[in-house]
From Swiss-Prot:
Motif range (TXY): 183-185
Disease: MAPK is overexpressed in highly metastatic breast cancer cell lines and its expression is preferentially associated with basal-like and metastatic phenotypes of breast tumor samples.
Superkingdom per UniProt: Eukaryota
Free-text comment on the cofactor: Binds 2 magnesium ions.
Name of the protein described by the UniProt record: Mitogen-activated protein kinase 12
Modified residues (Phosphothreonine): 183
Tissue-specific expression: Highly expressed in skeletal muscle and heart.
Active site: residue positions: 153 (proton acceptor)
Organism field: Homo sapiens
Keywords for the protein's UniProt record, in alphabetical order: ATP-binding, Cell cycle, Cytoplasm, Kinase, Magnesium, Metal-binding, Mitochondrion, Nucleotide-binding, Nucleus, Phosphoprotein, Serine/threonine-protein kinase, Stress response, Transcription, Transcription regulation, Transferase, Ubl conjugation
Length: 367
């Protein structure tokens, strides 16, 4: 059997958990960190700056048109994002020297250390930290929403946190209906807005605000707020707290099935949030009552939530970068596998790193 060709000049090869990695020589000390449905992540040290980075290798991104489309969208979304509370790209590279050879690419991002899910398992968070973490979630969401993107699947596991309690949102805009079919991974519904769970109607960016409310409540109480065993049970758990919606809301549902289901439910009164959220400050309770509203049209936006008195000590209007709308008209085009490869290769080669590569950037990098 012939041995594989030598590594590309300026690259080196290493086996990581039975997978061959070929990365740029500036990234040293590859250590496996974790793996998910679509790829594996290693930490590394950037030899130019000494900064720790996370490198993600997608599993066979061009195994099918569906996977190729997802890989292309992930790359374009990450390239678009330049905000301190949203994960962005420090670098992207391929060891493949031509389009014909192109099979893999690697995404380099800031290394964060942990995620909110792990953090909550290990310690009870105090009010100040909860306030700071929720503030950062909302700032990141305001930016993502201004770009015209809906996260759709915000949960503690995709909120990365470092040792300074700085937070970055991961995996935004990637949750599509096809995911479970592609990977067999079961999607957790506990943080999903009712209109997403039941496909009630065209949903808006406030689906993400519902998720923030669920996460904030969990940080306060140490327990998952709505822990349904399936989607109908999830809805029942939600309504035990929010109460059943008025008839006028039910009429607005686009699905007849959902309308009939809702009409058949016993009437439930809205609970007093303060009784569920023991130990929460009155301002925290008030903010949660504005986020966990069954009717999406009545839910606060990220910008409105940030202006809430709960964040008075943190609010800083100077801090907000402008964002261009993300053009997703390229993402849903039907292309052959070779066309997906070609457009992805072009995106990899056209990447320009943020100006302060790997350095700690206190203000957002302008687009």
């Amino acid at each position: 059997m012939s041995s594989p060709p030598p590594a590309r000049s300026g690259f080196y090869r290493q086996e990581v958990t039975k997978t061959a990695w070929e990365v740029r020589a500036v990234y040293r000390d590859l250590q496996p960190v974790g793996s998910g449905a679509y790829g594996a992540v290693c930490s590394a040290v950037d030899g130019r700056t000494g900064a720790k980075v996370a490198i993600k290798k997608l599993y066979r991104p061009f195994q099918s048109e569906l996977f190729a489309k997802r890989a292309y969208r992930e790359l374009r979304l990450l390239k678009h994002m330049r905000h301190e509370n949203v994960i962005g790209l420090l670098d992207v590279f391929t060891p493949d020297e031509t389009l014909d050879d192109f099979t893999d690419f690697y995404l380099v991002m800031p290394f964060m250390g942990t995620d909110l899910g792990k953090l909550m398992k290990h310690e009870k968070l105090g009010e100040d930290r909860i306030q700071f973490l929720v503030y950062q979630m909302l700032k990141g969401l305001r930016y993502i929403h201004a770009a015209g993107i809906i996260h759709r699947d915000l949960k503690p596991g995709n909120l990365a946190v470092n040792e300074d309690c700085e937070l970055k949102i991961l995996d935004f805009g990637l949750a599509r209906q096809a995911d479970s079919e592609m990977t067999g991974y079961v999607v957790t519904r506990w943080y999903r807005a009712p209109e997403v769970i039941l496909n009630w109607m065209r949903y808006t960016q406030t689906v993400d605000i519902w998720s923030v409310g669920c996460i904030m409540a969990e940080m306060i109480t140490g327990k998952t707020l709505f822990k349904g065993s399936d989607h109908l049970d999830q809805l029942k758990e939600i309504m035990k707290v929010t109460g059943t919606p008025p008839a006028e809301f039910v009429q607005r549902l686009q699905s007849d099935e959902a309308k009939n289901y809702m009409k058949g439910l016993p009437e439930l009164e809205k609970k007093d949030f303060a009784s569920i959220l023991t130990n929460a400050s009155p301002l925290a309770v008030n903010l949660l009552e504005k986020m966990l509203v069954l009717d999406a049209e009545q839910r606060v936006t990220a910008g409105e939530a940030l202006a809430h008195p709960y964040f008075e000590s943190l609010h800083d209007t100077e801090d907000e970068p402008q964002v261009q709308k993300y053009d997703d008209s390229f993402d849903d085009v039907d292309r052959t596998l070779d066309e997906w490869k070609r457009v992805t290769y072009k995106e990899v080669l056209s990447f320009k790193p943020p100006r302060q590569l790997g350095a700690r950037v206190s203000k957002e990098t302008p687009l």
